[in-house]
Regions:
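Terminal beta-strand-rich extracellular "head" domains
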Residues: 53-54, 59-65, 76-158, 162-199
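Intrinsically disordered, low-complexity regulatory segments in eukaryotic proteins
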Residues: 10-17
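Extracellular disulfide-bonded cysteine-rich modules/repeats
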Residues: 22-24, 31-32
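Residues on the solvent-exposed faces and adjacent turns
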Residues: 17, 27, 37
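Short acidic/polar mixed-charge low-complexity motifs
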Residues: 29-31, 112-113
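Short, solvent-exposed loop/turn segments enriched in Ser/Thr/Gly
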Residues: 69-71
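Glycine-rich, low-complexity segments
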Residues: 1-10, 30-60
């Protein structure tokens, strides 16, 4: 049996918890949402998750020094809580045909002109969120560019994140391979920013 609660008044809907002070929303006997006695989410719950799912039949290329991969990959977020954890995730297919090169990538905070949540410095090493050395085999040298980063929001100020990519010189192909035969592909780039409540 399905129960529907409809709050169609300007006063909204008020649900009162039991004497424990904790309110739980359940589905099929499993707790899906817990609101504490202070009226806040329990730690670990997702507050919001803006994302971009970018596809195109037009090839996107990147070569040389680290730079923004595409302005179409920008994701904006205004954290609800300064103490929240922001979890950035990128998943992309790439092709680096017939090349032996190192590739790098990192997230970038466009608003504050900085690379967020970097690993510590160590000598002259590049500080990045992802790297790979690609060996040449053919025109369809396919690889995955999957990386994450996480850190405290620090404030509730709006900010916009994007993805930067670079190589030692080879040209990387995204979204669509040069080969248009059945062995070529078109594939998406997915970028999301998840705010996780962390009181």
């Amino acid at each position: 049996m399905t129960s529907l609660i409809n709050a169609d008044t300007s006063g909204g809907l008020k649900i009162t918890s039991d004497t424990s002070g904790t309110l739980e929303v359940q589905s099929a006997g499993n707790t899906k949402l817990t609101v504490g006695s202070g009226g806040t989410l329990a730690a670990g719950h997702v507050v919001q998750r803006p994302f971009v799912y970018h596809t195109s039949a037009t090839q996107l290329t990147s070569a040389g020094a680290l730079s923004e991969l595409s302005t179409s990959l920008r994701v904006s977020i205004t954290p609800t809580h300064a103490s929240s954890i922001l979890f950035l995730e990128c998943s992309a297919w790439l092709c680096s045909p017939n090349s032996i090169n190192i590739h790098w990538a990192h997230f970038y905070d466009v608003t504050n002109t900085e690379v967020p949540f970097l690993p510590p410095a160590s000598g002259s090493r590049k500080r990045v969120h992802w790297s790979i050395r690609i060996s040449d085999d053919g025109n369809n040298d396919f690889h995955n560019m999957i990386f994450t980063a996480a850190g405290t929001a620090g404030s509730t100020d709006a900010r916009t994140y994007t993805i930067w990519h670079g190589t030692e010189g080879a040209t990387a192909e995204f979204l669509a391979s040069t080969l248009s035969s059945a062995t070529g592909v078109t594939a998406p780039i997915v970028f999301s920013v998840t705010e996780i409540y962390n009181p």
